Amino acid sequence: MASIKSLAKDTAVYGLSSIIGRFLNWCMVPLYTLMFPAEEYGVVTYLYSYVALALIILTYGMETGFFRFANNNSDNPMRVYSTSLISLATTSTLFMVLLCIFISPVSKAMNMSANPDYVIMLALTVAIDAFTAMPFAYLRYQNRAMRFAVVRLINIGVNIGLNLFFLLLCPIIYNKVPEAISWFYIPDYGIGYIFVANMISSVLTLVMLVPQMRGFKYEFDYQLLRRMIKYSLPLLVLGVAGIMNQTFDKILLPELVSDASNAMHQVGIYGANYKIAIVMVMFIQAFRFAYEPFIFSQNKQANDSDKLKSYVDAMKYFIIFSLLIFLTVMFYLPVLKYFIAPAYFEGLKVVPIIMLAELFFGIFFNLSLWYKLTDQTQWGMYFSLLGLAVTVILNVALVPRMGYMGCAIAAICCYGVMMVASYVVGRKRYPINYDMRNAAFYSVVCCLLYMIGIYMPVDNEIVLLALRTVLLAVFVAIALRRENIPLPKRLIGKK
């Protein structure tokens, strides 16, 4: 139980930076959707889909590889870190140089011939973020969650501050005293300033992480790197397939919609409503940051029965909290929808589908521990490729007829298939007796409460939200009672 408390503590700290950071970024969505029409916001969504894919490729699974080998008694952790750092620095630099050389054909292939500067800025951002992934991983390895959180939050704060400066303050200054900022501000640059802000904040993050790149002897162990790449290569394929499962729909959507002139509009609508489901993504991300170091340290230190129980408990509480998040977002959607402009409301129907898809992905991530601990990472690659096949097939089949709804359906089917496949194979290769009856119980309770809350015949929105709050309290009460979690005495009226 102590290990679960440690995991919960780290999840809370990592989650604070992840949740606050993503929430602050989330708060930018109203600004973007109010300032830019759907077709322009669609360009932002479209380009960041490529960014997510490029970042996975440029880190090539080295974060997980670092945790695996740094916790290996036969390897020197600092040599592992140094080798990883040098490797990422080399590949990130090479990526940036090659992109600058071939910027014209790359921009054309991305339908960005008119704005190659967008591509260059995002490429530099990706190169820096890929490299700094290793210092961030080192902070996690050292259990320096607070330092990790502070750097992340400063990065996000600067990014948001620059967005507000360029998009809101600069137009005001330019209208009154244009000569004061005309040397760097272009009024018509629009969404380009979103990319400028991101690039500057990434450079600042690199500077803040310099202490994690000093104070040790740099060593490059080629044989160690070969072993790490052999371990991490399947994770790269897994990561590429996984991120394509998350972003490929937004890349494919403009190519598959029946009305090409409406393509970026649909991407913008879908991307904005996808952001509403970010709460589930935030929780999964926070859990992931704490979970990977946790499972490797448990595997190294705990006995078999204790570590297996820890894995089972982690899955149980993950499912409970995820279902609670799902109900919360869906019950308060009448309020949360105002995080996007009314012109984007037509896409709200995708929110419950995307929320469940992200829940399935979170469970899949929890299940992934068996092939990481047994060095059978090729299975993660197989599952992700299976999911990618489902994503591509269903997008091609559904998007021409259903538009972005086809993307949402493809997403939930993709993660559902991956989740089931990982569970079935894992039962045979690394048996963990997950409490399926308990998971089924909470799923049924969640489904019943969801149906009651959504289809409740109440017209008054305030009353409706109050009743839905009661339903949320019912779910929490059931979980507390079933899991024998004591309430604080002051809440239950005891002295």
Predicted regions and their residues:
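Interfacial segments at transmembrane-helix termini and the short loops linking adjacent helices
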Residues: 103-122, 264, 329-359, 365
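Hydrophobic alpha-helical transmembrane segments
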Residues: 120, 150-213, 385-390, 404-425, ...
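Membrane-proximal transmembrane or re-entrant/amphipathic helices at the cytosolic face
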Residues: 453-495
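Interhelical loop/hinge segments that connect adjacent transmembrane helices in multipass membrane
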Residues: 1-3, 7, 174-193, 206-246, ...
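Transmembrane helical elements of multi-pass membrane transporters/channels
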Residues: 10-25, 194-209, 213, 222-297, ...
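Helix-loop junctions and terminal segments of transmembrane helices
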Residues: 58-74, 273-315, 370-373
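N-terminal membrane topogenesis motif
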Residues: 1-26, 75-82, 222-238, 312-316, ...
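Signature of the first transmembrane helix
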Residues: 3-63, 91-103, 125, 160, ...
